[in-house]
From Swiss-Prot:
Catalytic activity: dTDP-beta-L-evernosamine + 2 NADPH + 2 O2 + H(+) = dTDP-2,3,6-trideoxy-3-C-methyl-4-O-methyl-3-nitroso-beta-L-arabino-hexopyranose + 2 NADP(+) + 3 H2O; dTDP-beta-L-evernosamine + NADPH + O2 = dTDP-N-hydroxy-beta-L-evernosamine + NADP(+) + H2O; dTDP-N-hydroxy-beta-L-evernosamine + NADPH + O2 + H(+) = dTDP-2,3,6-trideoxy-3-C-methyl-4-O-methyl-3-nitroso-beta-L-arabino-hexopyranose + NADP(+) + 2 H2O
First-level EC class: oxidoreductase
Stated family: Belongs to the acyl-CoA dehydrogenase family.
Cofactor list: FAD
EC number: 1.14.13.187
Species annotation: Micromonospora sp. (strain ATCC 39149 / NRRL 15099 / SCC 1413)
Name of the gene this protein is made from: evdC
Assembly, per entry: Homotetramer.
Entry superkingdom: Bacteria
InterPro entries for this protein: Acyl-CoA_Oxase/DH_mid-dom, Acyl-CoA_Oxase/DH_mid-dom_sf, AcylCo_DH-like_C, AcylCo_DH/oxidase_C, AcylCoA_DH/ox_N, AcylCoA_DH/ox_N_sf, AcylCoA_DH/oxidase_NM_dom_sf
Listed PANTHER family: ACYL-COA DEHYDROGENASE, ISOVALERYL-COA DEHYDROGENASE, MITOCHONDRIAL-RELATED
The keyword Oxidoreductase belongs to this UniProt entry's keyword annotation: yes
Protein name: L-evernosamine nitrososynthase
Pathway entry: Antibiotic biosynthesis
Keywords of this entry: Antibiotic biosynthesis, FAD, Flavoprotein, Monooxygenase, Oxidoreductase
Length: 421
């Protein structure tokens, strides 16, 4: 892992990666982006997942970009550089970037488990990381339960587990080989715990439903997955503690898992800006004052967006390697700037794309125009956890006002599901 103090930092505006591993990943992407960009419109129209692009990612080692070099990966550890790579890809196609983010995120979090987990967890993490580096494993996260469903683990009576439930919004699902499923389990005394079983795609009782018809991110393969008494080995279960424990230490892992996604929405906004400004410049003559005001506003907001995201990523990178001190404080120190940046992105990125439509005019108000796709894709950012807008308001206001609350959105969801059951 690189030493943060030994590098000369440049303006954190996501213009370029900062580490050799980051530059390697961006250079590899450059060879596949033209085809991804050329196919983006058709895949958006038909809602088809770019299987061929991910096959190419596997051949190039990009499915193991965030796997440690010692395990055969490209060794990309810097969150800033991961976000920069995602931004580049999202400028071509946000759906592909969203799906790839799922794999990159698992590489980052599994690396932590490999370095700091119990012996069985370290062994499981190493197996998966090596398979990811070899292009043989695509690992999804399955977090959100279908409405009215609680995904649960029950003992199989022989030391293992049986998983039943239904998850929605599972991106990259068409090619997934493994699913990290956020579930609940109940002890004999009735206490409820959070756990994450790792379920193989070929597990009995697992069904991937081809039913995605989203407003945006239409080629991201964001499907539903059904689990009907799927067997789970004891050594493929990650324990996440009791529901309602109020452990802010978990916010660190949630930040690492999700903060790089901000690069996707920065990429969408950048792509929209480039289309609109290119259109304006290509019309001939000097643009009218109103158009020039829009252009100046676009670039101003984009710079504010990129630098805010860059600052939050820089903070997260520094905190992620510092395991000294109070774990709960570390979690808040990572999550709070992340949420400042996410709130900023969720406000500015859609506004940038909206002004781009105004700049281009009625020509952009067609389903086939690239700004139409970007307009729909950018709205996905507001629904991503952690946190959605309402949850982010609760978290940030709670931090400012010193409120005593559970900041783990997975724990809060579990409590709500038990209350409504």
């Amino acid at each position: 892992m690189s030493n943060l103090t030994e590098e000369r930092w440049v303006a954190a505006d996501l213009r370029a990666p900062l580490t050799p591993a980051g530059r390697t990943v961006v250079d590899l992407l450059a060879g596949v982006i033209p085809r991804i960009s050329a196919e983006a419109a058709d895949r958006d129209r038909t809602g088809t997942f770019p299987v061929e692009a991910f096959e190419q990612f596997a051949k190039l080692g990009l499915m193991g970009a965030t796997v440690p070099a010692e395990l055969g990966g490209l060794g990309l550890t810097r969150l800033y550089d991961v976000a920069t790579a995602l931004m580049r890809l999202a400028e071509a196609d946000a759906s592909t970037a969203l799906a790839w983010h799922v794999q990159l995120s698992r590489g980052l979090t599994l690396t932590y488990e490999w370095q700091h987990g119990t012996p069985p967890v370290r062994a499981m993490a190493e197996r998966l990381l090596r398979a990811m580096a070899e292009g043989e494993a695509a690992v999804c996260g399955a977090l959100k339960d279908a409405p009215g469903v609680v995904t649960e683990l029950h003992s199989d009576g022989a030391g293992g587990w049986l998983l039943s439930g239904r998850k929605v919004l599972v991106s990259m699902a068409p090619i997934a080989t493994h699913f990290f499923v956020h579930a609940q389990r109940r002890d004999d005394d009735g206490s409820v715990f959070l756990a994450v079983p790792v379920v193989h795609r070929d597990a009995p009782g697992l069904t991937v439903l081809d039913n995605w018809d989203g407003l945006g991110m239409r080629a991201s393969g964001t499907l539903e997955v059904v689990f009907d008494r799927c067997p789970v080995r004891a050594d493929e279960l990650l324990e996440r503690g009791p529901v309602g424990a109020r452990r802010d230490a978990v916010l660190a892992g949630q930040t690492v898992s999700s903060i790089t996604m901000l690069g996707i929405y920065a990429g969408i906004a950048q792509a929209a800006r480039d289309i609109a400004v290119g259109f304006c410049a290509g019309r001939g003559g000097e643009p009218r004052a109103g158009a020039r005001a829009l252009v100046a506003g676009l670039d101003t907001r984009l710079y504010a967006l990129r630098t805010t995201v860059g600052a939050a990523l820089t903070n997260a990178d520094a905190a992620s390697v510092d395991l000294s001190g109070d774990p709960d404080e570390r979690g808040r120190r990572m999550m709070t700037p992340f949420q400042y940046a996410k709130m900023t992105v969720n406000e500015l990125a859609p506004a940038v794309v909206d002004d781009c439509l105004s700049l281009v005019g009625g020509l952009a108000y067609t389903a086939g125009h690239p700004l139409s796709r970007l307009y729909r894709d950018v709205r996905a950012g507001g629904f991503m956890q952690p946190y959605s807008y309402v949850d982010a308001v609760d978290y940030l206001s709670g931090q400012a006002l010193g409120l005593d609350r559970d900041n783990d959105y997975m724990s809060v969801r579990a409590l709500r599901s038990r209350t409504s059951a």
